[in-house]
Amino acid sequence: MFVDQVKIYVKGGDGGNGMVAYRREKYVPKGGPAGGDGGKGADVVFVVEEGLRTLMDFRYQRHFKADRGQHGMSKGQHGRKSEDLIVKVPPGTVVKDEKTGQILADLVTHGQTAVIAKGGRGGRGNSRFATATNPAPEIAENGEPGQERDVILELKVLADVGLVGFPSVGKSTLLSVVSSARPKIAEYHFTTIVPNLGVVETGDNRSFVMADLPGLIEGAHAGVGLGHQFLRHIERTRVIVHVIDMSGLEGRDPYEDYVTINNELKEYNLRLTERPQVVVANKMDMPDAEENLQAFKEKVGDEVKIFPISAVTKQGVRDLLFEVANLLETTPEFPIHEVADESDTSVMYKLETEGVKFDITRESDGTFVISGYDIEKTFKMTDFSRDESVRRFARQMRGMGIDEALRARGAKDGDIVKILEYEFEFID
């Protein structure tokens, strides 16, 4: 089964927790702090595997959660970083964040990698919090939560040339006679329901990959007739070969077919019109084909170069292949996506107080609910079993401006404040 789009969940490993520990040393309060830092959580890394051809495996496994880092230990020993979770994908896979629509990676070459969900850093042990006024702190951090997201995987076939046109115009037959590909061919519409690839050799030491794409119909750009699934595979091609049935046996007008297909390409992705297009008048061995071709030429004008062929008899096919090979030599690749830059520019352990974003809402029972990435991360990294950690969290909330914002919303002593699933009292 050919699967070219799936939604999956990925989560980087949480960082390991820092440790509160002390060493035994004479004249040093409590022996001095000796708690180690937690190890970094594992990343979720996508790797291109050239042997894969479809996203079928993701139909059965849709959750990928990397391991957390090892916790810090006594004697100042830091936890070990966990090994990254490797997820293999086929060449041509585009990874998109479902929530934002951002393109996270465009994976095309064997061995190419991309970090899709970063692991969290390890929490600091108590030795990191020692100061002149507090030489033996009873405080350590929990590990930072790993990044988590839902992502859409789209497979867009890697081909130099894409065959487009209405169903049953002869695309599959053409591919079968110019390459060793053996697509399914029959006298009914939508025989081809998945892309078929074939390597074409021109006879003068040139070759290229051609894709027979499923037939398009009017409204394909809006998803009619599985149009989105079909059209996405054209995006990587450098040359479009537009196959038109000149026989008239289907009762359609060749010129109307030509206009309709080009409109669908334009509506789906305007950049598809930048690619050179070779117009192929197929089925020229049929009785009315010559007359239909003349009428077609009158409507499109002299600017459109047309290659009359018969895929069945191979008439005109050689000239067509040479034209396509010539175009490929002068046509650059078209980048189909601008990949988002998610490089980590944060400074470890530095609390940024400017621009901290959070939301405060109020439930029907009067509970204040605080949400936002920074406060939720800080909350998760706090060890609430230790009083010093609780006091530090209170200072961090004040530093973020949350206390002041709660007062502005009318919060008073004893009001309930909620972060994630935890509730506590507001003390002014």
UniProtKB/Swiss-Prot annotation:
<dbReference type="GO" id="GO:0003924">
    <property type="term" value="F:GTPase activity"/>
</dbReference>
<comment type="similarity">
    <text>Belongs to the TRAFAC class OBG-HflX-like GTPase superfamily. OBG GTPase family.</text>
</comment>
<keyword id="KW-0378">Hydrolase</keyword>
<dbReference type="GO" id="GO:0042254">
    <property type="term" value="P:ribosome biogenesis"/>
</dbReference>
<keyword id="KW-0342">GTP-binding</keyword>
<dbReference type="InterPro" id="IPR036346">
    <property type="entry name" value="GTP-bd_prot_GTP1/OBG_C_sf"/>
</dbReference>
<feature type="binding site">
    <location>
        <begin position="190"/>
        <end position="194"/>
    </location>
    <ligand>
        <name>GTP</name>
    </ligand>
</feature>
<feature type="binding site">
    <location>
        <begin position="310"/>
        <end position="312"/>
    </location>
    <ligand>
        <name>GTP</name>
    </ligand>
</feature>
<dbReference type="InterPro" id="IPR006073">
    <property type="entry name" value="GTP-bd"/>
</dbReference>
<feature type="domain" description="OBG-type G">
    <location>
        <begin position="159"/>
        <end position="329"/>
    </location>
</feature>
<dbReference type="GO" id="GO:0000287">
    <property type="term" value="F:magnesium ion binding"/>
</dbReference>
<feature type="binding site">
    <location>
        <position position="192"/>
    </location>
    <ligand>
        <name>Mg(2+)</name>
    </ligand>
</feature>
<dbReference type="InterPro" id="IPR014100">
    <property type="entry name" value="GTP-bd_Obg/CgtA"/>
</dbReference>
<dbReference type="InterPro" id="IPR036726">
    <property type="entry name" value="GTP1_OBG_dom_sf"/>
</dbReference>
<dbReference type="Pfam" id="PF09269">
    <property type="entry name" value="DUF1967"/>
</dbReference>
<dbReference type="Pfam" id="PF01018">
    <property type="entry name" value="GTP1_OBG"/>
</dbReference>
<comment type="subunit">
    <text>Monomer.</text>
</comment>
<dbReference type="InterPro" id="IPR006074">
    <property type="entry name" value="GTP1-OBG_CS"/>
</dbReference>
<dbReference type="InterPro" id="IPR006169">
    <property type="entry name" value="GTP1_OBG_dom"/>
</dbReference>
<comment type="function">
    <text>An essential GTPase which binds GTP, GDP and possibly (p)ppGpp with moderate affinity, with high nucleotide exchange rates and a fairly low GTP hydrolysis rate. Plays a role in control of the cell cycle, stress response, ribosome biogenesis and in those bacteria that undergo differentiation, in morphogenesis control.</text>
</comment>
<keyword id="KW-0963">Cytoplasm</keyword>
<feature type="binding site">
    <location>
        <begin position="165"/>
        <end position="172"/>
    </location>
    <ligand>
        <name>GTP</name>
    </ligand>
</feature>
<feature type="binding site">
    <location>
        <begin position="282"/>
        <end position="285"/>
    </location>
    <ligand>
        <name>GTP</name>
    </ligand>
</feature>
<feature type="binding site">
    <location>
        <begin position="212"/>
        <end position="215"/>
    </location>
    <ligand>
        <name>GTP</name>
    </ligand>
</feature>
<feature type="domain" description="Obg">
    <location>
        <begin position="1"/>
        <end position="158"/>
    </location>
</feature>
<dbReference type="InterPro" id="IPR031167">
    <property type="entry name" value="G_OBG"/>
</dbReference>
<keyword id="KW-0460">Magnesium</keyword>
<dbReference type="InterPro" id="IPR027417">
    <property type="entry name" value="P-loop_NTPase"/>
</dbReference>
<feature type="domain" description="OCT">
    <location>
        <begin position="350"/>
        <end position="428"/>
    </location>
</feature>
<dbReference type="Pfam" id="PF01926">
    <property type="entry name" value="MMR_HSR1"/>
</dbReference>
<keyword id="KW-0479">Metal-binding</keyword>
<feature type="binding site">
    <location>
        <position position="172"/>
    </location>
    <ligand>
        <name>Mg(2+)</name>
    </ligand>
</feature>
<dbReference type="GO" id="GO:0005525">
    <property type="term" value="F:GTP binding"/>
</dbReference>
<dbReference type="InterPro" id="IPR045086">
    <property type="entry name" value="OBG_GTPase"/>
</dbReference>
<dbReference type="InterPro" id="IPR005225">
    <property type="entry name" value="Small_GTP-bd"/>
</dbReference>
<dbReference type="InterPro" id="IPR015349">
    <property type="entry name" value="OCT_dom"/>
</dbReference>
<protein>
    <recommendedName>
        <fullName>GTPase Obg</fullName>
        <ecNumber>3.6.5.-</ecNumber>
    </recommendedName>
</protein>
<keyword id="KW-0547">Nucleotide-binding</keyword>
<dbReference type="GO" id="GO:0005737">
    <property type="term" value="C:cytoplasm"/>
</dbReference>
